[in-house]
Amino acid sequence: MSLVQIQLKTEDFKIYLQLPVRSQQHNFIYPLLFQEYIYVLVHDRDLKRSIFFANIGYEKKFRFQIVKRLINRMYKQIHLTTYYSNYSNKRTIYGLLKSFYYKLLSSGFSFLFEIPFFFKFISERKKILKSQNLRSIHSIFTFFEDNLSHLKYVLDLLIPNPPHPEILVQKIRYWVQDASSLHLLRFFLHEFCSVKSLITTNKSKRNERFLFLLYNSYICEYESIFLVLRNQSLHLGSMSFVTLFERNIFYGKIECFAELFAQDSQANLRLFKDTDPSMHYARYRGKSILASNGGLLLMPKWKYYIVNFWQCYFYLWFHTERINISQIDSHPFYLMDYISSIAQIPSMVRSKMLENLFLINNDMKIFETFVPIIPIIGSLAKAKFCNLLGNPISKPVWADFSDSDIIERFGRICRNIFHYYSGSSKKRSLYQIKYILRLSCARTLARKHKSTLRGFLQSLGLKLLEEFFTSEEQIIFLTFPNASLNLRGVSKGRIWYFDIVYINEQANF
């Protein structure tokens, strides 16, 4: 099949997906699994790196004969479930799980579930461009700086594990009307997928695209019902969910939610009417926060509502310990690898009016963010850069690389950590991490050359120091070559970047 034919097939597929729901109700996704070009698109390098998440590593070996053989099996109705007729043959089952047929079929199936939302994203890209910076993780902290300092309480929520596969299929059927595709999804969930693995943050050899799709459909269902107080609908497509794939969720202010929901449940939400409805919600991965400036009765009511929601709608036993209610000004909260809190000592802002006619002193609360140094040192110790006390050690695994490669690896990790935690209010912890990585790099090089650490540092000198410069330090060093090497005073202020779309697990150790 030529590239021109594949492109024409893709255009036909796009037109097919844009048909009204009634026209594609019986032939929505399942018939497309019998088309060869779908598997070509899955394997194609350009589409592997989707805009939704990074490359997940498909099989490098691709043969049209395998695809045609799989399609012929499906045409002849040789179902995968027939392999399970003999459960005593465990080798056959294991071979089926690891077979290339299953990988092709699951990859094509998840690809077909993803593309409709991709076209929806393209059709609304003009709206996205106006708020493109909101895709960055750091954008949510700028939102916190403007709004959380004026609020009183925060509800810290750990989202439960996904429910039973059958319940998950029942929830997905609200936005997928193809019965055949749902049966195939049920087969994948019951026979191949571990539901607990849907929320794991570790890299796995499983089909990550398929797992991310299922997990985000579960989150979408939860948040659409969770925002029923605002929209009076049980199956809401949230404004933030232009696509249903993992990225930081950015919500605006929820205003007047009591009036929107009062018509349906006046008795249950009677106490909400007398409170200030200013409320903010944010989520990343399996953790979310709900902040409000309401009274003492508002947040416990929300906690009671959330617990009953998980138990009644998803049939999950939700432990109340997973929800914590605290005051923002006295208890910090942990979100997106940052420790956030409100400064105990407010900042004084003095306003001058009409040339010394009078002065106005305003106390302003400052939103602060800190680096979680203990978890980062734990990650460094797990990656064999230091011990649990933070003392640098050599990394023998990298001793076989060249000197420039070793220095570049350590320097890249250091720069990535500095880049992500550039919004920290205090940079002292970051320089401690830089010290650990720099000394670990020197110990690794000294181990490679069978030299002492002191002698190696004296011979290497400035070359080792320059590789660990951050982007801000590099600009100053190039502009002022005679500047002091002690650059700890550089970039004391917080810097938020709008090019960070995911947490890279402490620079991919």
UniProtKB/Swiss-Prot annotation:
The keyword RNA-binding applies. It comes from Cuscuta reflexa. InterPro entries: Domain_X, Maturase_MatK, Maturase_MatK_N. It is found in: Plastid. Keywords: mRNA processing, Plastid, RNA-binding, tRNA processing. Usually encoded in the trnK tRNA gene intron. Probably assists in splicing its own and other chloroplast group II introns. Coiled coil: none annotated. It holds the Pfam family MatK_N. It comes from the Eukaryota. One of its GO terms (biological process) is mRNA processing. One of its GO terms (molecular function) is RNA binding. Belongs to the intron maturase 2 family. MatK subfamily. One of its GO terms (cellular component) is chloroplast. Its main location: plastid. The gene is matK. This is Maturase K. The keyword RNA-binding applies.
